[in-house]
């Protein structure tokens, strides 16, 4: 997972084949991988849904005019799929979403969160990031994000407790007011 989540398709393919892939190989394999992924999501609505209480959390952010965006290493086709599938335009300014365009360094580089903060007109220290991937947490730390919240969706809570940059660990968005609080929550 460490070498797969939050990474560019080029990085994932390079890891999988243990050598530098050609641009043609990256395009072909990435297109096939992403099409399969979207197809799986369409067929498995039970498992392809927003995290529990995410809609309430996003409604709260929107209703309170709290700046928000998405910073993902997914490529444009997947971002468009997510926007349509989850109706994300209800909560996000689509022009401010940051995604892998082939120019942004993949996580754990800080670039994606620096760009997201700039798009929102904020400093990275003024931002809260909710992240599930270890590479994304490292990316947020490297960017100087003020508060990093780990959502334990792919790994057990104990995994995130070992990561010093994590300020808070959640399993869903139920307690969303604590998530956006700049008060740091002690991680035991």
Where are these regions (language model features)?
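N-terminal helical cap/lid subdomain that shapes the substrate entry/recognition surface
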Residues: 1-55, 59-64, 77-80
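Asp-based, Mg2+/Mn2+-dependent phosphohydrolase catalytic module
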Residues: 59, 75-77, 81-188
């Amino acid at each position: 997972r460490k070498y797969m989540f939050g990474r560019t398709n080029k990085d994932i393919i390079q890891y999988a084949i243990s050598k530098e892939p050609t641009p043609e190989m990256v395009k072909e394999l990435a297109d096939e991988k992403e099409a399969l992924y979207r197809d799986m999501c369409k067929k498995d609505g039970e498992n392809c849904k927003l995290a529990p209480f995410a809609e309430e959390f996003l409604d709260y952010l929107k209703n309170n005019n709290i700046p928000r965006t998405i910073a993902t290493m997914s490529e444009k086709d997947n971002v468009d799929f997510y926007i349509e599938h989850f109706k994300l335009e209800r909560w996000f300014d689509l022009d401010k979403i940051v995604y892998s365009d082939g120019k942004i360094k993949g996580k754990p580089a800080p670039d994606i969160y620096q760009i997201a903060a700039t798009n929102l007109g904020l400093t990275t220290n003024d931002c809260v990031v909710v992240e599930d991937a270890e590479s994304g947490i490292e990316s947020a730390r490297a960017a100087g994000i003020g508060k990093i919240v780990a959502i334990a969706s792919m790994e057990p809570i104990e995994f995130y407790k070992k990561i010093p940059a994590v300020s808070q660990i959640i399993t869903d968005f139920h307690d969303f007011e604590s998530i956006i609080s700049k008060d740091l929550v002690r991680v035991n």
